[in-house]
Amino acid sequence: MRGADAEARAAAHLQGLGRELLQRNYRMRGGEIDLVTREPCGTLVFTEVRQRRTRRHGSAAESVTSRKLALMHRAAQSYLIREHGRDDLPCRLEVVTIDGPADNGVLQVLPLNT
């Protein structure tokens, strides 16, 4: 249940920043987006949530691979086409990391340059 706890905390944090939560766990063949939100300005944000209880295997941010980024990009394009009929809407990708326990670990929002 740790993954769901981390996603719930990330969603609450993003909503606290004024974003509207549009969807959790958007799935498509070969990819998934943990959270889809919309900023007050209308930009859609596709978020991967990563949590690591310890640094034994690196930080939460270090667990995001280039393969995962490619899958996120593909899933975001799929979402745009499926939900909005086009893939040229203002949007971006980000990772929310939680290092430590899901309920009180250090949370960071990291924009991705893709």
Curated annotation (Swiss-Prot):
Name this polypeptide is given: UPF0102 protein Deide_03080
One Pfam family here: UPF0102
An example Gene Ontology molecular-function term: nucleic acid binding
Organism: Deinococcus deserti (strain DSM 17065 / CIP 109153 / LMG 22923 / VCD115)
Coiled-coil spans in chain: none
Protein family (similarity comment): Belongs to the UPF0102 family.
